Amino acid sequence: MADQLTDDQIAEFKEAFSLFDKDGDGCITTKELGTVMRSLGQNPTEAELQDMINEVDADGNGTIDFPEFLNLMARKMKDTDSEEELKEAFRVFDKDQNGFISAAELRHVMTNLGEKLTDEEVEEMIREADVDGDGQINYDEFVKVMMAK
């Protein structure tokens, strides 16, 4: 399934994988998965985290390595309920629930994920997505960016 991904997608997933793989050992544990999910405002139980890992843990060793992670991401991209997932993701970024993602909100979420971005980098991310030029990202703009990945 991962063989349908472009080089760009694989590179992007490698970056995401390293955000999860806090200790850099090449595997994502339930603890690391939990840390990242909580930084995104989710609150999964230990059992839910284990289920998520078991879902993609092909070799049954209790952790997710990069090839397993790629398969998970390829599956997620094919999921038809991605509309709901996009809304959920948008809500994570849109802290004040005003229907827009501001530079401050974007910076906040990226910082929680351990990505220290300069003001310039945050502004650049907003500019790339901001079709109507109002300085923030609305839901339609967010969907365009997420679907273009």
From Swiss-Prot:
GO molecular function, one term: enzyme regulator activity
Keyword annotations from UniProtKB, A to Z: Acetylation, Calcium, Metal-binding, Methylation, Repeat
N-acetylalanine carried by residues: A2
UniProt-listed InterPro entries: CALM/Myosin/TropC-like, EF-hand-dom_pair, EF_Hand_1_Ca_BS, EF_hand_dom
Residues recorded with modification N6,N6,N6-trimethyllysine: K116
A Gene Ontology term for the protein's cellular component: cytoplasm
Keyword Acetylation: yes
Alphabetical list of CDD domains matching this protein: EFh
Positions of Ca(2+) 4 binding: D130, D132, D134, Q136, E141
Sequence positions that bind Ca(2+) 2: D57, D59, N61, T63, E68
Family annotation (Pfam families): EF-hand_7
Function in brief: Calmodulin mediates the control of a large number of enzymes, ion channels and other proteins by Ca(2+). Among the enzymes to be stimulated by the calmodulin-Ca(2+) complex are a number of protein kinases and phosphatases.
Assigned protein family: Belongs to the calmodulin family.
Protein name: Calmodulin-3
Provenance organism: Oryza sativa subsp. japonica
Lineage of origin: Eukaryota, Viridiplantae, Streptophyta, Embryophyta, Tracheophyta
